[in-house]
């Protein structure tokens, strides 16, 4: 008589799941470079199971975000994850029971925010030895700095003309170029940022502007002439 019995243990199948990488720019919680939360790859389901793996809503934690995901973290490399309970499979019965889900976190990168200078114009008068006169100050474009960061433009930026521009070609070794308008010929040098959060910003100096060379004023005084009535010739040594 064989009445022996026992228990059967069915262990969970291991399911490796890797998350993809996401990229943001400091100051903007939206993804860049075509990235988004998602599953990069995973092991195949077994035992005839068929279904589509996805990420459970609300399960994501992302080191690239702070303040309840309302702001980006500082520039840097972080991770985002969901944990094993954050992976679900539509159409697979007892998915969480039958699989030991092991998740590899995805990278979450925050790039520096690129900020730009305002264009600036300059002018001079033909033949002037005083150089270019700048119309205003070198400044950052509006809304460049975010989150109340204490970052600003350092004093000392200077405005001149492009060495390879039309103004320089016309000027040569003279004090100024010919009178006229020289578009996109301004060059800004020495522009730097100062502050406590400099690592989160990248200053892009592609500012330019118009150089206007005004005509020089040339006063000309004419001499006096004298004639005698009835004779068109000059007298008194005039002429």
Region annotations inferred by a language model:
Residues 1-239:
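Short loop/turn motifs that initiate or flank beta-strands
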